[in-house]
Amino acid sequence: MRKSVLRLKYFVVLLFLGVVSHGIAQQETSVLFIGNSFTFYNYMPGILKDIASANGKTMHVDTAVTGGKDLKFHSGRQRTYEMIKSKKWDYIVIQGHSNEFAQPDGKVDTLTLPFAKKIIDSIRLHSPCSRVLFYMTWGYKNGNPKWKAIANYDSMQLRIERQYLRFADLFNAGVVPVGMVWKEVRDSYPFINLYDPDRFHPILTGSYLSACTFYTTIFGETPYKNKAKIAIEPIHREAIELASTKIVLNNLARWRYLPKLKLIEPGFDIIIKDKSVHLVSNAKNYDQVEWDFGDGIRSMDIKPKHIFSSPGEYKIRQELSSYCKNEVLERTITVD
């Protein structure tokens, strides 16, 4: 951080705009995925990263995933918590097993809810600035024939949709409505196959649909005509991009849209006249500011004034905070 000492007898205005690297460089968006094969098939997080990169955005993605597992498994797995603590994530995605989210409320509240809570409690403790997103998955191609209530696609999808939205409300989280974009493509473009031959996993086209839905949800913008390289039919690709745009952006309130938290940008001007100093904050994205004049006096005014009792060198300190972040900016002056 640049420092300079002011030695002016009469009147000086010092403009200091906060020389911090993140105020200039492209911000990275980091996402941790906790889930199973519906997340890692075709390395969907990597496709998301490619879409973002093609649109000039920088992403860091990582996973804590194991095939076929539910939230009970993830809540008892050490890697889940190691990954939560490993970075200040912008988003942490939670994806349960499709069958567990297709159960009645009573079963979900017993078999899933406590384990989702355990994971989210850890997120709120160790990564409080992270936005929690629930990855709403899709119904199996023909539903699950083992359970009469979800023995067809529509019944299974409806239950999955309902439970993920309920969990979003319970935990003040957002939803990535992959399952609803999936339904839109099934209904509007029946010639597009999204399913693996096993009738529940995604083929590459289905994973691209998931990635487009994540991109639209996280960045609040369309993936339409992005230049990422992906080996699917152009007409299928265009339909998926339009469907994710329509379903996500036309229903942001329904998905409990949670934009990425903005970084605090510190900055202040200093006006000096003799031993009198006037500070003016031009910082951004903060809730509270507190000043330290370097002589034992502090202030919480936005534009505080202070008279130093004696000449000398003083370190002016601006302390900014939001509900989960803090930034400090210091500037040294000399008062004659």
What spans do the regions from the language model cover?
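Bacterial Sec-dependent N-terminal signal peptides
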Residues: 1-27
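Conserved SGNH/GDSL esterase-like catalytic core that processes O-acyl groups on lipids
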Residues: 28-32, 38-119, 128
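Alpha-helical cap/lid subdomain in secreted, periplasmic
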Residues: 83-204
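Short alpha-helical patches at coil-to-helix transitions and adjacent helical residues
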Residues: 41, 204-211
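Conserved catalytic region of serine esterases and O-acyltransferases that act on ester linkages
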Residues: 201, 211-271, 311
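Ser/Thr-glycine-rich phosphate-binding loops at phosphate-binding pockets of nucleotides
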Residues: 37, 203, 284
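Extracellular/lumenal mature domains of secreted and surface-exposed proteins
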Residues: 259-336
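Structured segments of extracytoplasmic/periplasmic soluble domains
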Residues: 37, 41, 47-55, 95, ...
